[in-house]
Amino acid sequence: MISRKEPFLPKKAPGWLAFLVCFGAVAADWPTYRADNSRSGVSTDPVPGVVSEAWVWHSQHPPRPAWQGEAKWDGWNKVFDMKARQTFDRAFHVVVSGNKAYFGSSADDKVYCLDTTTGRELWNFYTEGPVRLAPTVAEGRVYVGSDDGHVYCLDAQDGHPIWNVRAAPSDRRIPGNGRLISAWPVRSSVVIADGTAYATAGMFPSEGVHLLALDAVTGAERWRQVQTDLPAQGYLLASATRLYIPAGRDNPVVCDRATGKRIRVVDGNGGTYALLAGGDSLVFGPGKTGQLNALEDGPSDQLATFQGNQMIVAGDRSYLHSDTELSALDRGRYLQLARDRKSISRQQGEIQKALRKLDAVAGSDSEKAKLKSELAELGVKLDARTQSMEECLAWKIPCRWPLTLVLAGNTLAAGGQNEVAGIQASDGKILWTRPVEGAAYGIAASGGALFVSTDNGSIHCFRGTNQRASLKPPTTLESRTP
């Protein structure tokens, strides 16, 4: 179902402009969650060596996450102190286009627009359910999904609705998180690529989980696919040909972008954090124990695992972020060694299989001795590769900011409890720390400024200025409604 208000339909921009906006090529913008459809968390805009708080915006109510936390332990697998794997809505994550910052609220069901210079609220728009994931901005439009089961397209300038589509198959409502929500909430964000808006609706596989493609200008449905085995929760990712759908605590689903047909479910340990580290090379996690799984383009089995919460990939460097450490790796060398190690392990498995067959048929001792010798040689090679992988470390520092990590120019910005930090990417030197109100789960970088979102509903803006203004959302501003 599409509802439209044609007077607010802006003119269509050229296709090349959509590509630039959606994939983060416009240097000053951060138009979607973690900057681009790969969720890279990287901006080319540098941050000043010293920053000050320019303004802070306070919500009247803190975020209301859909999931309060992970179970304390997995008795069957004897895993204790499990990591939370569904943390996508613990803060109001900000996106930035031009001089405007946009975010959704899980507390009051609104989409907000702020002036990035002053923090003043410019407009807001009501949906009929919590808005748990950040909007996406493209071609002068703001796209966002809500727990009410709808995808909305708004005018980025004034918040007027352009169209809204019921992504859910019906308007059935159910109790959820103390609210009345759609039986098919939109909890995967909206991805814009090549004039198409992609979204999902549904988190109960037995009810059907819908993946759909819409015309980004008109909202017309292009295709719809339904899966009945996995949920859809977490930020969608898009490559040139594929869509990646985080599945909450389960492993991501890979689909064809042209048709929505499933390609595979990847192997791993689940979680809603995901990154495309070049092409279709996927990193995701954090699993039950805080592990990131790395898969290359094509194979479904793991290439490597890393102990960490998030990863930044920039050129030949990878920055790995864990609960206690931040480190930089020589990415190219590390991955080649990981490939070699994987190949050696595969050869070991084949030889061990051959030895078992010889044992079963009482094979000759000389043949067994030859295979055992080959196995020992492979063990030496494997140890050498493992040692070389450890030597790929460029630097490592203790880190008390484990909640989020982005890269702006040559500065890594990390969020922690009541504090954010700037770290020099080249050598790990801590440049500055600044206090914030609450746990800093979200950081956006644009135009030399950092926008930090916390779990108490605050949004802090830091830039190279001494200006400060503490702002509360105005109570008299007229709200837009569907």
Name each region found by the language model.
Residues 1-11:
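N-terminal secretory signal peptides that target proteins for export/translocation
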Residues 14-24:
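Bacterial N-terminal signal peptides
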Residues 29-75, 165-167, 210, 373-385, ...:
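Blade/loop signatures of beta-propeller domains
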Residues 30-34, 83-111, 128-152, 179-212, ...:
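Repeat-blade elements of multi-bladed beta-propeller folds
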Residues 48, 55-59, 106-117:
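Beta-propeller domains
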Residues 55, 78-83, 120-125, 163, ...:
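A short beta-strand motif characteristic of beta-propeller blades
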